[in-house]
Amino acid sequence: MKKYDIVIGKQFGIINGEKNIVFIKTGRGGTIEGFKNKYLNICDFLFKKYGYTFVVSANPKDSVCDLEEEIKSVDKYVGDYKEIYFVGISNGASIGAAQCSKIEKIKNAVLINAPLMINFHKIKEGAKKFRGNNMYFLYGEDDPSCRYIEILDSIKNTACKYKIIKGEGHDFSKESLIYELNYFLTG
């Protein structure tokens, strides 16, 4: 069975690579493995293709996330890197939208099914301040937030874009995640 190179408590799983970090923040209640090892399998597949360092961060139900602190806490385990690709799932996407602008090394973010009906003001404010190259909001066509997707047009930042993924709901399949992350990592 595949394993992370480093596991820090139940909070972080790391596959060590080179150059860049892909930092994945799971949805509320998400573990570093994900359902049926989804995150571990995705990281392993993409690591073999790109060789980047992958960090998966759990999202315990009753926790408050400080993304900057989380990244600092794994720095000593991942070595030197040029930039961070941030991937957020559901609540992890909301966290990314609200907090990525505070972290200079995050140049690109993909935010999957961030709930738009919960604290949208935080999503909007953070995304408006994002100084990176791209902040992609992805929504499954059957995700409850998809019907509100046009509210993202109120974010005045040319880096922010959104896309609807046909045939997906709130929980993207492993195959769809790999496809979208492949596209994201190759620009």
Spans of model-derived segments:
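Short, surface-exposed "cap/lid" segments of acyl-processing enzymes
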Residues: 6-56
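Gly/Ala-rich beta-loop-alpha elbow adjacent to hydrolase catalytic centers
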Residues: 87-96
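Short beta-strand/loop motif that positions the catalytic acidic residue
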Residues: 130-131, 136-139
